[in-house]
Amino acid sequence: MFLKLQKSKNKPKEYRDINGTAWLTKLIKNFLLLKFSLAMIVASPISYASNFHEEITCLATNIYWEARNQTVSGMIAVGMVTKNRVKRNTFPNTYCDVVYEAKMSKWWKEHHNKDIPVRNKCQFSWYCDGLSDKIPSYDREVWEVSLYIARGIYTDRYVDNTFGATHYHAYYVSPKWARKFRHTTTIDDHIFYRYD
């Protein structure tokens, strides 16, 4: 067999080439080094994969709580607003950081070592409304739709139906900030705005 190597008599720790196959031995060594290097590189997508999962979960959670009673188009619109915020340098640069951006209660941190958002001081109202953020088991189907939409938004499968909106509110409220923003569209119960 041409891969047969023999221990050198002079140097027991080295090998000598019997059939002129040193090039193949080098190739195998380089392949093994490359395989090791690739294994090290491939280890980093594990963190990417967990980040991907976390980001999808954060985005889906926001879509669920903000738009679970809207059409699919309305759910996509809420997800797009979240994405548009991630893309702007005036907001955090991850979905989880955008969704959970809030002023935290110092008292809770000092007395209970917990981060609890201050009511009405969050980017998205569901996060600081004082209610549980656990997805109810009876609403698993809507949660699955939210996850599907979140994956599509994260992987750029949808066109931005909000035309770059970074803010929105329900039609039945009139926040002061809305006067400073440009109206882009209305989808279902939400009115969308962009800060130009």
Name each region found by the language model.
Residues 2-5, 48-196:
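Bacterial extracytoplasmic/cell-wall-associated proteins, especially those involved in peptidoglycan
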